[in-house]
Amino acid sequence: MAPPSRAVDALLIALTMVPVAHAQPVSLSPATMPRIGAVDERFQSFNTEMLEVTGGRFWKPYKAYPAGAKPAPMSSDLYEYRPPADLTKPRLRKLAAALGPFYLRVSGTWANSTYFQDTDAAAPATPPKGFNAVLTRRQWKGVVDFARAVKADLMISVAISDGTRDDKGVWTPEQARALFAYTKSIGGRIAAVEFMNEPDVANHGEAPKGYDAAAYGRDIAVFRPFLRQMAPDALFAGPGSVMEGGKVKISIQPELVTEKLLQATGPVYDVFSYHLYAALSQRCGGAMPGLGTTSAAALSEDWLSRPETIHSYYAGLRDRYEPGKPIWLTETAETGCGGDPWSSTYVDTFRYLNQHARLAQKGVQTIAHNTLSASDYALLDEDTLDPRPNYWAALLWRRLMGPVVLSPGAAAGGGLYLYSQCMPEGHGRVTVLAINAGPSARELNTPLPGARYTLTAKELESEGVELNGHLLKAGPDGSLPSIQGMAFGAGSLALPATSSTFLTFAQAGNKACQ
């Protein structure tokens, strides 16, 4: 904890003197909170789009449009060319490493049609027939080197477009074999694989015309033995479907709904995976009324509960078709299609933290946020690499929330959400995450002293975030500020309106955390 000072004392007084709403105080008992599960040590994981690696047209940031202008829904102006990402930047590596260890998922819609050029030559001006992009050895080595530097294990999907298929339209492994072999030859390791990105919307993902569940089943029958031969230790995750089970409905092909995919393959996966976007951003949702959301809804129970609703749908499919298999959420963000303008602001930290905490309670082992550093929903600004509010939320989670999940044992309500996990170091120590999404301060009672880490902002759509009243900023080289808790004593504890607070209890002595 930080050493005492007049400034800290003044801030502590300010936090404890916050006017509290008339809701009944909620009592915590950190010593007796029972264990209800555990998550992977790489629970917080992150996506880098394959298109970032190769270069190409990705979701255009809102700041790139003239002031006051909005992207025309479903137009070519939704995209902006990016050159291949420079993954050697020291600032990027330092900021990413602070979140490790994690899975780095290199995939996305564009990965479905990316050709791996297994020579040291430069990429050709035009991709080979049946592909839309080219991945060079140099580019892929950059990914492998980056993953090693930031303590990440690689997760990928492979190309499945027309260029990978035989004359009967069945997938062939030559391209994937070259990528796996080259990865191994340079000392890399692929830890997990999804066959393709989002097979239930294959009509948007460069699958062959007329692709259906039966075709998917035939492909998996070829891919699974190939994977066992080339990377016997790699986890086979799937199916990796998206946009089912929630309020937002898009044009899923009836012949490709997840249940039909699972029926076609049988129980083949090591890990059941799915993707989750509770709505579409302004880029895509504007053309389809009812598919988007608003910043005004960002703190509502309806919005914050959507991830659990969608998870329940996929968990039900897992239980029927892959019983007992771990479940991973391998791609998610505020909204699909690059995120909304406010996905890069403080208001989205409530969704980020609540989704992680709530799904940890539901048994999700890994959640891969999309993306690390591309477009509006990224943790880092893609031009400056400045950390956005969700980065700081992720950093606090990494430092304070361990893998053992506890029940907080206290009902809250009224916009207050409580979660608890053992601290990363164990030793009986407990962290409680208190998310106050309401417009008024709330009160907790605790029998133990501890330290608080309270995230707030001047405005909900602020691009900055404060920790215990101090603005968080990274140095030019990616160095991080001191992340220190503020001591509090046993008794009453005030939670500011629209704030998220991590409360650590080093003296909890919780047997589940030993």
What is the predicted function of each stretch?
Residues 279-337:
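Glycoside hydrolase catalytic-domain groove-lining segments
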